[in-house]
Amino acid sequence: MELDARMDDLECRQAFQDDTLQALNDVVVEQQRSIERLQLQVAALIKRLEDVQGLVGEAGEDEAPPPHY
């Protein structure tokens, strides 16, 4: 009888571990998706920053230096 109880306990533990493992896997998948979205947003922001810096650089090249130079 004790062997049956131990087997039941082990089966129950395995079922809980399977559920926990699946929940953790779901979290990891969602985190990976979030990371990918954030990487795309950072790349877009870098591109916009480079564009703005290019515009500022072009405008600054046409101006004469200040009188104190």
Curated annotation (Swiss-Prot):
Signal peptide: none annotated. Coiled coil: none annotated. Pfam families: SlyX. Belongs to the SlyX family. This is Protein SlyX homolog. The gene is slyX.
